[in-house]
Amino acid sequence: MYDNKQLQEISTQVRRDILRMVCSAKSGHPGGSMSSTDILTTLYFNVMKQDPATWTRDGKGQDMFILSAGHMTPVYYSVLARAGYFPVSELASFRQFGARLQGHPSIRKGLPGIFQASGSLGQGLSAACGLALGKKLYKDDNFVFCLCGDGESE
């Protein structure tokens, strides 16, 4: 468990990562990423039951996170890297041809920590509901978290 000062320090690192990634790629959506930094930092470092060392794509025995607003990948990738899912140095490859870190999260590139591809706004919440129902049916008492965007709100 991290205290508030540690969470603030991680959030500051994540915000720096976001700016570096978007500026280096000359592409991306920094606004949503910057505004959701504290949410994802708190989830991954103080709320969610997750461990990069034991992570599995099926989500059994762990909390799951779905980023419905898929264009906010800079914050998602930075938090995943800072939580230990892949090296922080890989953030430099954001949106480069052939890289795992593209503009929307994808499960095809084998990036650990991502349970659901997203991109079409409005699909993440329904996917998260389905994953939560699956957890309930299989008696997995872990949680599914979803960061919704304007697609679910309109």
Predicted regions: what is each one?
Residues M1-V14:
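N-terminal hydrophobic or amphipathic helices/low-complexity stretches enriched
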Residues S11-S27:
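N-terminal capping segment at the start of a domain
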Residues I18-M21, S33-E154:
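Cofactor-binding active-site loop characterized by glycine-rich and histidine/acidic residues
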Residues P30:
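Histidine-centered catalytic micro-motifs
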